[in-house]
Curated annotation (Swiss-Prot):
Disulfide bonds: 118-179, 145-208, 149-210
Originating species: Rattus norvegicus (Rat)
Subunit (UniProt): Homodimer; disulfide-linked. Interacts with GFRA1 coreceptor and RET: forms a 2:2:2 ternary complex composed of GDNF ligand, GFRA1 and RET receptor. Interacts (via propeptide) with SORL1 (via N-terminal ectodomain); this interaction affects GDNF-regulated, but not constitutive secretion. Also interacts with SORL1 in complex with GFRA1; this interaction leads to GDNF endocytosis and lysosomal degradation.
Region (Disordered) location: 76-113
Name of the protein: Glial cell line-derived neurotrophic factor
Signal peptide: 1-19
An annotated GO BP: commissural neuron axon guidance
Name of the gene: Gdnf
Family according to the record: Belongs to the TGF-beta family. GDNF subfamily.
Functional description taken from the UniProt entry: Neurotrophic factor that enhances survival and morphological differentiation of dopaminergic neurons and increases their high-affinity dopamine uptake. Acts by binding to its coreceptor, GFRA1, leading to autophosphorylation and activation of the RET receptor. May also modulate local neuronal effects in distal regions of the motor neuron. Involved in the development of the neural crest.
Propeptide residue span(s): 20-75
Keyword RNA-binding annotated: no
Amino acid sequence: MKLWDVVAVCLVLLHTASAFPLPAGKRLLEAPAEDHSLGHRRVPFALTSDSNMPEDYPDQFDDVMDFIQATIKRLKRSPDKQAAALPRRERNRQAAAASPENSRGKGRRGQRGKNRGCVLTAIHLNVTDLGLGYETKEELIFRYCSGSCEAAETMYDKILKNLSRSRRLTSDKVGQACCRPVAFDDDLSFLDDSLVYHILRKHSAKRCGCI
């Protein structure tokens, strides 16, 4: 039963208790006629009874009010109790229904990371590790280009690839787009272990592109 329905029932009970008819044996006592000679006014009429008036009407009214208040409090608490009474198995099933969506989202993010395009990657090295024949303790951040250029292929690249597979072209090898530097870092200056000054130009990538 909804809250408003219960309130309506309570109001009907309250109205019934307040409008309860007088018990049998009750009648109005008519006031005596006005005595003009003495100048007295009419005496207000009062209730009289052949039997004693029951004393339980105030108690009945209090019982109705207590019932209304208890019903309203019970209805206010009922939504919280229903939520608390939700079986643990139902809550676990709802959590399990939400978890596959999260796992699928993580899988898609992982696939995007694997299939990334041409990007710039950095690694910390010693100049000697470059394999250029320098003996030095100088260090640098070497940046290089890595990744696939399939997403950057144009219609021209696709046509060349198809013609090369069908052997419609000459024996010349057709080049494909590669992930290459399109800009380089500033020159690197350093001293080797023999105190000889060296300069490395275009040694590290700054920006990458498919060319």
